[in-house]
UniProtKB/Swiss-Prot annotation:
GO terms for cellular component: cytosol; small ribosomal subunit. InterPro entries: Ribosomal_bS20, Ribosomal_bS20_sf. Gene3D superfamilies: Ribosomal protein S20 (1.20.58.110). Belongs to the bacterial ribosomal protein bS20 family. It comes from the Bacteria. It comes from Borrelia turicatae (strain 91E135). Keywords: Ribonucleoprotein, Ribosomal protein, RNA-binding, rRNA-binding. This is Small ribosomal subunit protein bS20. Binds directly to 16S ribosomal RNA.
């Protein structure tokens, strides 16, 4: 870590952003698991509604560059394939 003021500020910013990103990624994992569980239980109607919510969250995270846009697309694709089975 640097000693000049700008380097110290960047370190503080990186710490804050890292905490926020970890929180969002954790939330994404949780809602993806909930969607998977709804699909496995055969609750298609609920799963479809929840899939829309998950899709929106993934797109938002990709737009804010918390996850890569291709990763968001891949996760949405995999969930939709499972949902349509």
């Amino acid at each position: 870590m640097g000693n000049n003021p700008s380097a110290l500020k960047r370190a503080r910013q990186n710490l804050k952003r890292n905490l926020r990103n970890v929180s969002v990624k954790s939330e994404l994992k949780t809602i993806e698991k909930r969607c998977m569980n709804l699909i496995r239980e055969g609750k298609k109607e609920e799963a479809l509604e929840f899939f829309k919510f998950v899709s929106k969250k993934l797109d938002t995270a990709a737009r804010k560059r918390i996850i890569h846009r291709n990763k968001a697309a891949r996760k949405k694709s995999n969930l939709s394939i499972l949902l349509l089975r």
